From Swiss-Prot:
Role description: Catalyzes the dehydration of the S-form of NAD(P)HX at the expense of ATP, which is converted to ADP. Together with NAD(P)HX epimerase, which catalyzes the epimerization of the S- and R-forms, the enzyme allows the repair of both epimers of NAD(P)HX, a damaged form of NAD(P)H that is a result of enzymatic or heat-dependent hydration.
GO MF term list: ATP binding; ATP-dependent NAD(P)H-hydrate dehydratase activity
EC number(s) from the headed UniProt entry: 4.2.1.93
UniProt enzyme class: lyase
InterPro entries listed in its UniProt record: CARKD, Ribokinase-like
Name listed for the protein in its UniProt record: ATP-dependent (S)-NAD(P)H-hydrate dehydratase
The reaction(s) this protein catalyses: (6S)-NADHX + ATP = ADP + phosphate + NADH + H(+); (6S)-NADPHX + ATP = ADP + phosphate + NADPH + H(+)
Domain YjeF C-terminal: residue ranges: 61-350
Binding-site residues for ATP, renumbered to this chain: 256-260, 275-284
Cofactors demanded by this protein: Mg(2+)
Pfam families per record: Carb_kinase (PF01256)
Annotated residues for binding of (6S)-NADPHX: G161, N214, V215, V216, E217, F218, Q219, R220, D285
UniProt keyword terms in alphabetical order: ATP-binding, Lyase, NAD, NADP, Nucleotide-binding, Phosphoprotein
């Protein structure tokens, strides 16, 4: 069994005091390199038994996330802060790709492209003139036409509103293969996860990919890999998430729930920010859009944690803060559009680096 790394600013699985050296705040500091918030837990035969509630520290993951956010500058040109693509959108589902794309823009992406079916394009265009919409997914030569656009985009979300039409799924499979060859970061959600469940080999070993399953999607993915998914406690859920990530060759898993679990191979962090008890549709689309943007930023930086792990953590944090703020204002009437309205406030208060030059 290999060593598993756990990160601060979250619930951390720790050994008992007899198995590690603890600092004055109760933080396990054994095997820490330069005390940068990376905790190495010595593996045990039994699952970890003790959860330690960590305090936010100077070198937390949130601090690491701030470092990758590009400073606003008069000297930059359009596109440098991020060009995000959303591959999804069908006749039945037009809101999901819109939520993902507009959320990426509200978090700081300069441009957002939506690649959807022809029947969805006019509707999505009507939601916002800020999105660039390509009605290409269901045309006969879709992959050839998309070849012009895919390399121009820094990161992609695959799945929001995609639908399960076989012809479209086959097109998306070809797109995925091309994105892997081009080494472009991708986030896969919703019907994109359905595609991966049918054929996990599509994504196996691609460590620039993040999968974002909810509880049901996690069960299906685990079944497809012949893994356990029935744990009822956080310890077991963490180990299951790590196991799925490793079974997929190190692909990052963001297991959504009351406590979000982000696992990148043997490295994992949990995020227990309080979100909203209002479970309106579209919150996962906001999450995936913001995560794709963070994934571009983290891969374009020299951050200490794995880029996909940091991107997953930052996006989960931002989404839950947005949900909480929106619920405080709107209560039972909270909708995803209310969460999107909170993105700027949450971003400014938690991710803007006050020392960055704004010139």
């Amino acid at each position: 069994m290999s060593t598993i790394l756990f990160y601060t600013r979250a619930l951390i699985i720790g050994a008992t005091k007899s198995q590690g050296v603890f600092g004055k705040t109760g933080t396990l500091v054994a095997n820490i390199s330069s005390n940068r918030g990376i905790i190495s837990i010595v593996p045990r035969t039994n699952p970890p038994q003790k959860l330690l509630k960590m305090q936010e520290e100077e070198n937390s993951l949130l601090e690491e996330a701030r470092k990758v956010v590009p400073a606003l500058s008069f000297g930059k040109h359009k596109g440098q802060a991020g060009r995000v693509g959303v591959i999804g959108g069908s006749e039945e589902y037009t809101g999901a790709p819109y939520f993902a794309a507009i959320s990426a823009m509200k978090a700081g992406a300069d441009l957002a492209h939506v690649f959807c079916s022809k029947s969805a394009s006019t509707v999505i265009k009507s939601y916002s003139p800020e999105l660039i919409v390509h009605p290409l997914l269901d045309v006969p030569n879709a992959v050839t036409l998309l070849d012009e656009w895919l390399p121009r985009i820094h990161s992609h979300v695959i799945g929001p509103g995609l639908g399960r039409v076989d012809a479209t799924l086959n097109t998306v499979k070809e797109i995925l293969i091309k994105l892997k060859k081009q080494e472009i970061p991708i986030v896969i959600d919703a019907d994109g996860l359905f595609l991966i469940t049918r054929d996990p080999s599509i994504i196996h070993g691609y460590t620039k990919a993040i999968l974002t399953p909810n509880v049901v999607e996690f069960q299906r993915l685990s079944k497809s890999m012949n893994l356990n998914w029935e744990s009822k406690d956080l310890n077991g859920s963490i180990m299951e998430t790590v196991a799925l990530s490793k079974a997929l060759g190190g692909v990052t898993i963001v297991r959504k729930g009351e406590v979000d679990i982000v696992a990148a191979g043997d490295e994992v962090v949990t995020m227990d920010e309080i979100g909203s008890p209002r479970r309106c549709g579209g919150q996962g689309d906001l999450l995936s859009g913001v995560m794709a943007l963070f994934s571009y930023w983290t891969h374009n930086s020299t951050c200490t944690p794995p880029p996909t792990l940091l991107a997953g953590y930052a996006a989960c944090f931002l989404t839950k803060r947005c949900a909480n703020q929106a619920f405080q204002k709107h209560g039972r009437s909270t909708a995803t559009t209310d969460l999107i309205s909170e993105i700027n406030s949450v971003f400014v208060n938690n991710f803007e680096n006050p020392t960055d030059p704004k010139s």
